[in-house]
Amino acid sequence: MPDFSYRPTIGRTYVYDNKSNKNLGSVIKNAKRKKHLLEHEAEEKFLDPLDHYMVAEDPFLGPGKNQKLTLFKEIRNVKPDTMKLIANWSGKEFLRETWTRFVEDSFPIVNDQEVMEVFLVINLRPTRPNRCYKFLAQHALRWDDNYVPHEVIRIVEPSYVGMNNEYRISLAKRGGGCPIMNIHSEYTNSFEQFVNRVIWENFYKPIVYIGTDSGEEEEILIEVSLVFKVKEFAPDAPLFTGPAY
């Protein structure tokens, strides 16, 4: 007969059925995962009506090659509660020197390239260390040719300059600015009217004011440049010659 008496020296074996038991951690994780999926589905359904709308991408980061032409770098003092004009397009001698360098050296334009858009890019830097303020900017794209802009204006509804203290303005006219082709021949044939007839006829000529939200007079390093978005076409002839091409 079997001996059912209790003896501490004899161990006992228990067999557990794990079919009805689950790990507590996995139960909590699965519950959170299901909750997250339900919230995600509800959020997507809420945003479904937005599929009928289109959002324009930043053309500055779009396809094409950006060619930068630095117009000038200079230091200017800006007094509190005021904004100063930083770009004056009436200097013919200044434009002559700039555009000569632009076409001949730093910006080689050929006939198989197309200028799709022009950006005015303004970089601002404080010259004095340990200064804590933000840059302000205000611009207008269209103005009468006979209008003489003021050198200094009061701050009225400005916008803060964004990341990296860079203020970028698209000069393309509404409806897609007219692309410029054969720009080198236009420059060669009529230089005196090149800027006014070619560039400003197809793109806006802006006026820009810069200021700060500081309560003191600040010294600012300003770099103004034009960035041309160039579209390149496939060449007619292969780039390489040889038995493999």
Swiss-Prot record:
Role noted for this protein: Major component of the virus occlusion bodies, which are large proteinaceous structures (polyhedra), that protect the virus from the outside environment for extended periods until they are ingested by insect larvae.
GO CC terms, sorted: viral occlusion body
Signal peptide (from-to): none
InterPro entries, alphabetized: Polyhedrin
Family: Belongs to the polyhedrin family.
Pfam families: Polyhedrin (PF00738)
Keywords: Viral occlusion body
A GO MF term: structural molecule activity
Name under which the protein is recorded: Polyhedrin
